[in-house]
A protein has these predicted regions:
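A sensor for short, sequence-defined functional sites
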Residues: 2-13
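Conserved NTPase motor "head" modules and their coupling/switch loops across ABC/AAA+ ATPases, GTPases
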Residues: 12-27, 31-155, 161-166
Length: 169
């Protein structure tokens, strides 16, 4: 899509392909958003438990899948998500043409990690961030076991260096 938007200055006819491209992008994006949100939910369950164990029960880890604002429920039916994505893209259509950049879609999505209700990215210490990262890795390990029936090999380098003694235990 970005290529279409960038090249449209030299080849204005490319913009004629954008509505159909956006429609297909919304259909595929809906599948991706729903899958990611489902995975994030599994990750949240395991990561919260692992984080509680690593922090001695003193902290609560939460995860939230963040997508475009018009998608009210990323676990809704794909047709609902696709319609909401299309609404979002239509509201950004003029801005995308002006900037010649793709401004919305699943490529902009993120997982928000919080410890005790505070954004890990903005408010947590290095030890808390490392604990959250370790909890996420341990959660991925559990999901792998659920999916394939065995634990994966995990190589974790220098995991304990920035953790306080309680977390190291």
């Amino acid at each position: 899509k970005t290529r279409i938007l960038r090249d449209s200055e030299d080849f204005p006819g490319l913009l004629d392909t954008l509505p159909e491209f956006n429609q297909r992008l919304c259909l595929v994006g809906a599948v991706l958003i729903r899958y990611r949100a489902s995975f994030c939910e599994k990750l949240r369950q395991y990561a919260a438990q692992a984080h509680a164990e690593c922090s001695g029960g003193r902290e609560e880890l939460t995860l939230a899948y963040k997508t475009v604002k018009t998608v009210t429920d990323p676990l809704a039916e794909q047709s609902v998500i696709a319609r909401q994505l299309m609404d979002h893209q239509q509201s950004h259509y003029a801005a995308e043409i002006a900037s010649r950049l793709c401004l919305s879609g699943p490529h902009k999505d993120d997982i928000e990690v919080a410890v005790n209700g505070h954004s890990a990215r903005q408010y947590c210490s290095q030890g808390q961030v490392r604990t959250a990262a370790l909890a996420l890795k341990l959660a991925e390990r559990e999901i792998h076991k659920d999916t394939f029936g065995e634990y994966p090999v995990m190589l974790l380098d220098d995991v304990l260096s920035e953790l306080d003694p309680l977390r190291q235990e």
